[in-house]
Amino acid sequence: MGELAFLIFGRVIPGAVFVFLATVQVQLLAPELKVAYNDASNIGAITLIINRLLFLAFVSAVAMIYVFRKPPALGRREPIAFAVSMYASFVLLALGPVADFIHAPVAFNSSPTAILVSNVLLISGFALAAYSLAYLRFNFSILPEARAMVTGGPYRLVRHPIYLGEIIAGFGLVVTLLSWFSLAVLISFIAAQLYRTYIEEGVLVEAIPGYAAYRLKTPHRLIPGVI
């Protein structure tokens, strides 16, 4: 990738996308903070605010990473790699709007229990993703790219903890949007994340000496002792 192409597609466009996502979270926070201020015992509102703040921290950090990170040592740009990476990164964010557009049978479950469970899962997922990002830092990328190997923190337990956090958050989202359509989207999202790990690790093994040994030392991609 040339310098101009990297500037446009590796910095400006993805950075702008995550700045937009951060801006949306800030706008959504204002009325939710007002609700929590007026009713400090509203656990649903408080957990939703925590969820928003964690997601805001995550997307803000990603936006900054895209501005300052270096070009990759190696990357894959094939259509399948691009499509899977984009789908896994953004499909859950588009679940509600797409369901409305195609008139899918998705109804919001507003019961206090569903909202609480949803927010706990969302908070857990975003917290894990943000914690993992603090270790991955400027090596983060949506597309399959190799910059440096990270083995500390959550990467001692699994090789793709950010994706695990996103999957946990995905379950949290679907709890309040439960339908056959949302379940199908969630299953396809998890499948895309799994396939994404195979594509990325092919790049990392090829570009980074020692990554093959790290895979042997840390044998699980997403869940310790399972997969």
Predicted regions and their residues:
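Membrane-anchoring alpha-helices and their flanking helix-loop junctions
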Residues: 1-143, 172-227
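Solvent-exposed interhelical
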Residues: 147-165
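Alpha-helical membrane segments in multi-pass integral membrane proteins
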Residues: 165, 171-172
